[in-house]
Regions:
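Exposed, low-structure sequence patches enriched in small/polar residues
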Residues: 18, 80, 138, 143-170, ...
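Surface-exposed loop/turn segments flanking beta-strands in extracellular/periplasmic regions
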Residues: 53-65, 110-127, 420-424
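Transmembrane beta-strand segments of Gram-negative outer membrane beta-barrel proteins
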Residues: 1-2, 32, 60, 153-155, ...
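Short acidic, glycine/serine/threonine-rich loops at helix termini
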Residues: 44-48, 110-112, 169-171, 241-243
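Outer membrane beta-barrel
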Residues: 9-69, 74-106, 226-240, 395-410
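Aromatic- and glycine-enriched pocket-lining scaffold segments that form the walls
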Residues: 81-126, 133-146
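Ordered hydrophobic segments in well-structured contexts
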Residues: 3, 33, 86-88, 99, ...
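Outer-membrane beta-barrel proteins
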Residues: 3-18, 72-78, 131-134, 206-208, ...
């Protein structure tokens, strides 16, 4: 496989170049990959997809990760790929993984040539960003052993050692006091998965070279009427896992977070599902958003009712309370966010799917009483969209969406996941007043060749324009096109 990608504003059409050669045995158990690859093992503390799994409408699935082992790297995140050789070998109750990698990473350098920080956005649009490209070399060697002594029990251990050149400098600021520094990082972890009837016990614990640790453990129960999961997590402030992306509130590498998550799914009658989750979390050390310890909680209630064979109605309410730092007052202000979503899914035939969604959110800042009258603290936003997916032929399908949005400001912005070309995940942010439309086409030209294309346009104005400027000056029109040609042999 070969993947070339260029972000908007970048000069080179092949700013990102990825390639791989993959071999699978007839049993599909033994694998060998040369080139770019990734690993998804255990609960993701050491290796996982860069996108991970975030909380959503399903309260069970995101909290219990399924091991996908060794995979070709076919996504466009520019900082999560390993490049070299990797193999997966199975022998009865044992599985062995061996991997080597030599990759170039983006980084900002100090005047003395040491690494100031890792640059992870992947953008190389100007000289400043280009000067960060491929400044850091990482050599990595590691392995994994998985044993299944009995059919319902698996035990695993994962380890790797990476060497960086140049070295990462020690930083004095409180925010970066526990950031990675030095030339070498090592991780070793243990994981388990035990299934007994309807119950599943699972977890993973890992330690980095500087004795920072991460631990994740949970229990899952599944039945026809009720499923529930309880998951605890704790990631120390000095835990360094650059390829890890386990369950967390931050959605980043597991570090500086602890919390407990509980999720339920009930099916009281055939056509009705009720889904609930609650998550309480805290960040014991300052983060880049808040220069002091902070905490929060969120909950979701969702009901899905199948009105007819082809018509599904869903209602979702989500509440989130998180600490926010106000630089003007230099204090933490609690922020409440409430979101209500109503959705209809209609599938008149196996070829056509329609979706209509209405969504509204409310934002409230809990300022001290003396400040409430002086500063706005309530904001709202609303979104409406119509979505259609049409399969005109087994090898050809079209997806299109028309979206209207109206938000008070950036604080009340809304997001929507969109269909995109394979390997890309789009969670589009919308603020102001306007529309966003797109069309995506996927065409399997031959068994070994496929074409994907997406065209999108956004037209918007700010809700509170500057009186000194006209709407024409404030108008935003953004057009984008993504094209991907994929071949397999």
């Amino acid at each position: 496989g070969l993947l070339l990608e260029k972000d908007s504003g970048e000069r080179r059409l092949d700013d990102l170049r990825l390639y791989f050669l993959s071999y699978r045995s007839h049993s599909n158990q033994n694998r060998l990959i040369l080139g770019n690859y990734r690993l998804e093992v255990a609960q993701g503390l050491i290796f996982n997809s860069p996108y991970g799994y975030s909380k959503g409408s399903d309260p069970i699935f995101p909290a219990r990760q399924r091991e996908r082992a060794l995979l070709e790297y076919t996504i466009v995140d520019e900082n999560a790929s390993l490049c070299g050789v990797a193999g997966q070998f199975c022998f009865k109750i044992y599985q062995f993984f061996l991997f080597l990698s030599n990759t170039q990473r983006d980084a900002s350098l100090n005047d003395d040539g040491t690494v100031k920080n890792f640059y992870t956005s992947g953008y190389h649009r100007n000289d400043l960003e280009m000067n960060k490209k491929d400044k850091l070399n990482e050599r990595l060697i590691g392995g994994r052993v998985l044993i299944k002594p009995i059919p319902n029990l698996s035990l695993g251990t994962t380890f790797y050692r990476s060497i960086f050149d140049p070295v990462a400098a020690i930083q004095d600021e409180d925010l970066h006091r526990f950031s990675f520094a030095g030339k070498t990082n090592e991780l070793i972890g243990l994981d388990y998965n035990f299934i007994h009837r309807q119950f599943n016990l699972f977890g993973e614990i890992a330690r980095s070279r500087n004795n920072g640790f991460g631990v994740l453990s949970g229990v899952l129960m599944e039945s026809k009427l009720l499923s529930f999961i309880v998951l605890g997590r704790r990631y120390s402030k000095d835990f360094h896992s650059f390829y890890g992306n386990s369950f967390s509130e931050s959605g980043d590498n597991p570090q500086n977070e602890s919390g407990i998550y509980t999720g339920f799914q009930l099916k009281p009658i055939n056509n009705l599902k009720i889904k609930i989750y609650f998550d309480q979390f805290e960040f014991p050390w300052p983060t880049y958003r808040i220069p002091m310890p902070s905490s929060g909680k969120d909950m979701l209630f969702r009901t899905e009712y199948k009105l007819t064979k082809n018509l599904l109605f869903s209602l979702q309410y989500k509440f989130e309370q998180k600490d926010q730092f106000n630089s003007l007052f230099e204090q933490v202000i609690p922020r409440d966010k409430r979101n209500l979503r109503i959705q209809l899914d209609f599938q008149p035939s196996s070829l056509l799917r329609l979706r209509c969604r209405g969504e509204k959110n409310w934002i409230k800042y809990h300022y001290p009483q003396l400040l409430k009258s002086r500063y706005p603290h309530n904001f709202q936003g609303v979104l409406l969209y119509q979505d259609a997916s049409l399969t005109m032929h087994p090898n050809f399908d079209i997806a299109a969406r028309l979206t209207f949005f109206d938000t008070d400001n950036y604080e009340s912005r809304l997001y929507q996941f969109e269909h995109d070309i394979p390997g890309m995940l789009t969670n589009q942010m919308l603020d102001g007043i306007g529309t966003r439309n797109y069309i995506r086409i996927q065409w399997s030209i031959k068994n070994f060749l496929s074409l994907s294309l997406k065209y999108a346009t956004t037209h918007s104005y700010p809700n509170f324009p500057d009186e000194r400027r006209s709407y024409r000056d404030l108008e935003k029109r953004i057009h984008s096109i993504n094209v991907q040609l994929e071949t397999n042999w």
